[in-house]
Amino acid sequence: MLLLELPIKCRMCGRFLRQLLAQESQHSTPVGRFLLPMLMGFRLLILVSSGPGVFGNDENEFICHLGQPGCKTICYDVFRPLSPLRFWAFQVILMAVPSAIYVAFTLYHVIGYWEVPGKENKEQETQISKGDHSKDVSGAKSLKLLWAYVAHLGVRLALEGAALGVQYNLYGFKMSSTFICREDPCIGSTTCFQSHPSEKTIFLNIMFGISGACFLFIFLELALLGLGRFWRIYKHKLSFLKKLPTSESSVRSKDTTDELSVVEAKEPF
């Protein structure tokens, strides 16, 4: 019996996954369906493969002239309050949170409205007995997913913009090779040096470029969704206006026919 039930369960799981993927990408354009996931994957790949080699040993390679105990540690803390690797790792996790919430909402939506074989006819009969229309119900479901998708894009856009601003305030566009430190317990001022500033500048600008491209693509996705929504509303109104004169003319012709029949009936023979 278990062997006989296994293919049925596999088909049901496959149907459920297909419906989940279809609902998740129902309202997205090719920008949100392909370009944004590719950029997120590319950012994660660059960060994991090259980040530790560039910034992994940054504190040990930070050198100061004075050998005063604790001077190097304090100067490095002032020079770099937050490690770039930790900042970018936190950024990747933070950007994934809105997408995870949207996928969870879609999963809840699919589980709540997923129709098991044999259940569809019962739901249709219930809707007909209550006077509901299936198109209205499906339209309401689709509208909820659309607004959830737009909201998650808006949150991602705000987070990307905030991350760009924080990254610029922390690191700028160039990693300097020297740093003048005047903090205690250093005696007077000391000059400190960081290793491979050119390599770190290139990596920093690459991460800036990826974040900027993500910001632009999210904004483009929102713009395309707005234009598509406006175009559908415009087409609906246009088709309604095209149908309106024909309906009015048919009503007028019907009224004219009724008036003629009344006049003919009143005329004496």
Swiss-Prot record:
The tissues where this chain's protein is expressed are given as: CNS specific. Expression is restricted to brain, spinal cord, and sciatic nerve.
**Which segment of the chain is annotated as a signal peptide?**
none
The UniProt record lists the keyword Phosphoprotein: yes
The Phosphoserine modification is found at 261
The biological process GO terms on file are:
cell-cell signaling; myelination; sensory perception of sound
Q: Which chain regions cross the lipid bilayer?
A: 34-54, 87-107, 146-166, 206-226
Cellular component GO terms, alphabetical? connexin complex; gap junction; myelin sheath
For this UniProt record, the keywords arranged alphabetically read as follows: Cell junction, Cell membrane, Gap junction, Membrane, Phosphoprotein, Transmembrane, Transmembrane helix
Q: Which domain of life is it from?
A: Eukaryota
User: Where does the protein end up?
Assistant: Cell membrane; Cell junction, Gap junction
Topology relative to the membrane: Multi-pass membrane protein
- What's a Gene Ontology MF term here? gap junction channel activity
InterPro entries, per the entry: Connexin, Connexin_CCC, Connexin_CS, Connexin_N, Connexin_N_sf
> Do the record's keywords include Amino-acid biosynthesis?
no
Q: What is its main location?
A: membrane
Cytoplasmic topological domain ranges are 55-86, 167-205
Q: Which residues lie on this side of the membrane: Extracellular?
A: 1-33, 108-145, 227-269
Its subunit composition reads:
A connexon is composed of a hexamer of connexins.
According to its UniProt entry, the function of this protein is described as: One gap junction consists of a cluster of closely packed pairs of transmembrane channels, the connexons, through which materials of low MW diffuse from one cell to a neighboring cell.
Family membership noted in the UniProt record:
Belongs to the connexin family. Gamma-type subfamily.
Listed name of the protein: Gap junction gamma-3 protein
Which gene carries the instructions for this protein? Answer: Gjc3
